[in-house]
């Protein structure tokens, strides 16, 4: 440890002090100093300065009432002024007293680092502009009305990442909500109406959604937009899950473009109430066709099948076809079109 150290006290040489008390009362100030060697840029040991040195320092200071100042400092020695290691710290203890009765003695304990100011209570880094020289926690715990210690705006990294993730998802969620509340209502109503029309509003086991045959996708699958081909319809008895009443329907299967299409046709009521519309290839004209199930040949009853033709000879009772099961159904229809019988029948 190197620096300047001067030791003096009120009780030093009590006899001389009592003799000169009345004559030199203003010179009774005594000091205890420890100076860091980096201030003077030397590596000298302890040096004892005469009292005249401190008298000169006192004359240079601002004129004030007689005070007693005790200052004590501890610093580690170091010969290099550019040494900025973390161990280069200072420890001070200051006690300032005044002879005036109005001003009371004050004391403080401060641990400082180079360029920083530490809290006088806990030793943590204090706020730069805090007049009480304390950190936010200690300043609030003591109840100081400090305007420097406002609410902290610092957010941890985990909270920032969580908030950024929420903000990234929020725009997409708003778009979905806007679509569901906005134009999605009319589209849903149209889909429901189309579904009800295709199902006929009755107790059906399956519903078929009809789309425009001229839409895109037919070119890639090489399927014709419209075809006219004979088909064999097999009468069958069906019942709904919700409704115990049974009804009759017709099942068929055709081969178009190397693909097998099969389905069930349900009873939609009298032919005068339901019409089937079809459009031509160019979309300029539309024709209305009535689908009537005819008994064209006597063999239709024995094979339990009906051929659909565009004639108006009359309808056949489906129940008679269902009860007249004599021979197994032919696996192939006319024209070489294969038929795959359902396992339900």
Swiss-Prot record:
Domain of life: Eukaryota
Residues binding Zn(2+) 1: 119, 122, 130, 135
Organs and tissues of expression: Mainly expressed in the filaments of flowers, the shoot apex regions and pollen. Also present in leaves.
DNA-binding region per Swiss-Prot/TrEMBL record: 119-146
Gene disruption: observed consequences: No visible phenotype.
Protein residues bound to Zn(2+) 2: 119, 135, 139, 146
Residue stretches of biased makeup (Basic and acidic residues): 9-28
Keywords assigned by UniProt, alphabetized: Activator, Auxin biosynthesis, Auxin signaling pathway, Developmental protein, DNA-binding, Metal-binding, Nucleus, Zinc
Motif Required for homo- and heterodimerization boundaries: 256-259
Gene Ontology CC terms: nucleus
Compartments where located: Nucleus
Single GO term (MF): metal ion binding
InterPro entries: SHI (IPR007818), SHI_C (IPR006511), Znf_LRP1 (IPR006510)
GO biological process, one term: auxin-activated signaling pathway
UniProt key word Metal-binding: yes
Main localization of the protein described in the UniProt heading: nucleus
Region (Disordered): 7-28, 168-200
Its biological purpose: Transcription activator that binds DNA on 5'-ACTCTAC-3' and promotes auxin homeostasis-regulating gene expression (e.g. YUC genes), as well as genes affecting stamen development, cell expansion and timing of flowering. Synergistically with other SHI-related proteins, regulates gynoecium, stamen and leaf development in a dose-dependent manner, controlling apical-basal patterning. Promotes style and stigma formation, and influences vascular development during gynoecium development. May also have a role in the formation and/or maintenance of the shoot apical meristem (SAM).
Membership in a protein family: Belongs to the SHI protein family.
Name of protein: Protein SHI RELATED SEQUENCE 7
